[in-house]
From Swiss-Prot:
InterPro entries: EFG_II (IPR041095), EFG_III (IPR009022), EFG_III/V (IPR035647), EFG_IV (IPR047872), EFG_V (IPR035649), EFG_V-like (IPR000640), EFTu-like_2 (IPR004161), G_TR_CS (IPR031157). Signal peptide: none annotated. The gene is fusA. GO terms for cellular component: cytoplasm. It is found in: Cytoplasm. SMART domains: EFG_C, EFG_IV. This is Elongation factor G. The keyword GTP-binding applies. Residues 8-290 form the tr-type G domain. It comes from Pasteurella multocida (strain Pm70).
Amino acid sequence: MARTTPIERYRNIGISAHIDAGKTTTSERILFYTGVSHKLGEVHDGAATMDWMEQEQERGITITSAATTAFWSGMSKQYPQHRINVIDTPGHVDFTIEVERSMRVLDGAVMVYCAVGGVQPQSETVWRQANKYQVPRVAFVNKMDRTGANFLRVVEQIKTRLGGNSVPLQLPIGSEDNFKGVVDLVKMKAINWNEADQGMTFTYEEIPADMVDACEEWRQNLVESAAEASEELMEKYLGGEELTEEEIKAGLRQRVLAGEIIPVCCGSAFKNKGVQAMLDAVIDYLPAPTDIPAIKGINPDETEGERHASDDEPFSALAFKIATDPFVGNLTFFRVYSGVINSGDTVLNSVKDKRERFGRIVQMHANKREEIKEVRAGDIAAAIGLKDVGTGDTLCAQDAPIILERMEFPEPVISVAVEPKTKADQEKMGLALGRLAQEDPSFRVHTDEESGETIISGMGELHLDIIVDRMRREFKVEANIGKPQVSYRETIRTRVNDVEGKHAKQSGGRGQYGHVVIDLYPLDPEGPGYEFVNEIKGGVIPGEYIPAVDKGVQEQLKSGPLAGYPVVDLGVRLHFGSYHDVDSSELAFKLAASLAFKAAFNKANPVLLEPIMKVEVETPPDYVGDVIGDLSRRRAMVNGQEANEFVVKINAEVPLSEMFGYATDLRSQTQGRASYSMEPLKYAEAPKNVADAIIEARKK
């Protein structure tokens, strides 16, 4: 089979935004205008095509990033047909892992902002992730029809809050109820959409007289941005010559791909205005797979390798999402970076060093699927029934193994105990949790050794609620959940030297003997978390026992002496000890090390660390006093507030343990008008009274 769409005409894009900026509605409109779905799905009535898990439709938020393929030839059919793979990413902070993971496999992103709310807390998180993976982006200011909409304010916020060099491609004609259309600053024409056919058709018209001056001024800004792309464009521009439409677009494209500017469009997805022009911007300015640098990887001999976006290179792909589908079982979404895969081929999972046979391959359109025979470089598809592929694994040709970059996943901050309501469900619950953990690396399951309880951990209350909910719906397991547990940590504040640990049992027969002397010292919280320094001189402890000392200490780190929480940010220096020719063993040195560590830890001014969350509350001005008062009762440190006439943003740092049930309390204080987001910020020392209470409770 030959390629149906040349790789230059592919666009792999993510659509990401803050909750409620209207991202799913925007994705829906893309599917509608590109001719894939014939009925518009509205999030309000729970029928949006992209939000396909039942809970997403109930809660009206997007949880799983569905990948969908759509085709586009431009508003005026001005391009050959392009193929756009759209990845819809969640905007809720508990699902940041999904966003991070999809950023890995995207080439470009559309950032959706609300014309009223502007750049909101989650927008900043998503922006940082896009920077981390150097993803070129365009912005779409949505909800221009809402009261309080202000396009230029959002353009300004992209500069001041995110540090993005925003360049408007359009200006809105009217706003709020009078929002009629947009002026295209490249063509210098007004675009009006036809409301009778849901905006499928539109007309180019003259710019309204009262907008001509503003449009001239902003066009100047646009042309200048384009001219900065190259010396020849700059010379032409400074020489007073007009740049052609092609030159302006080429200049802007070059600068977007270099990450220097963010073109901004506007519209109202709900009112069917502006989405097609935004799709044109995706084709004009966002990269094809061939425009981005080759993906780097690691060859089997640990040297660096790379794969270019070409069908002729060996096959390589990254599995970026595992989803459980009620009809076909496991769906593994993957992005092909190089080469071609056909159904029936066997490939290597180079991370686990196992072979996998590709059976059926499907291309997803939200939750409908079309079976295909092959997938080529630059494309995204899903495979059915792969046996042992996890998120972030590399799939590659058996004769050309490579491991593409590994993804890094955050540590969970909150845990709850779960137990099935009936004994019969015990095994089913284990299976269900295992399957869900395979799909979502930011979710962990383990059994508490002391209590025997099953503990699930994740990125926030909502994250765990949804896991329990999915167990009920998809696996028919009813479970009771305990009170949330916070992941505390233990560390030390002062250095202690020359603490010894001795394990000796020498009463006839083969004895046990190990003896170590260590120093214990604090490490910087930004550092490695733990280090072990061996400074044994003259063989007072033989080399083969040194790893046992390290191991003995590390086993103690899992459950600290204060309250049984993990120990972090300390170093151990082993500098003296003794051994016995016959009685010494690895086990004896391991035990000696653990005794020395416990003794040293208790002398080194041990403290309990608690997770601190970065919390941002947005509230109408009337409730600011109540909200701040309540935050102070939760031991918050309020760092400041920003206000406009509609909303006040309060930034605070709050211990996670004080944030349980906050959503409900905030709703009742503000009659449901405030919202908040939180993300893990750091660990900090817990005040003595708090620490004492926690340690006391753990002893019971």
